[in-house]
């Protein structure tokens, strides 16, 4: 779904904005998440499941980073460092494996096969999911910040999932670090001035794009 399409401008956006404005503030992340998944699912009905799977796995890994099992005080720091390092490695392997599979596997397989002169590695010809690079690196930045202690407390699942899948930047970026938007994800307020400024910027950007 393109931002300049009739479907987005006159169907999705009005319905989304209406729901977002009328629900209580504590439910707005649910609306944002649901709207973002619908936005992505219209263009990628199968790969929206991959996005959800990636979000669930990354959230589970980040929760493990902050898990504090019972242990003697003198061992807690050392165990925390080891646990966070292991969790970071697992998340990086998972995220970059998916990205490599969909984006670089065929190129690598074709190069190896060409050099070898035979079909050693199968070419999968997988369709590239929209925005996979952006949401993968966004989750990687989140995991790295958790490991480094930049993020001191993990958010709930819905704010995290909404942060990763937020439709305005899901398929075209930019990549945003969680600590830059944490306050707005968990405690933002709707102000008329901000809404007006947002509409002006959107209209200007749409005009430049069209």
Predicted features by range, described:
Residues 1-210:
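Membrane-embedded transmembrane alpha-helical bundles that form the catalytic cores
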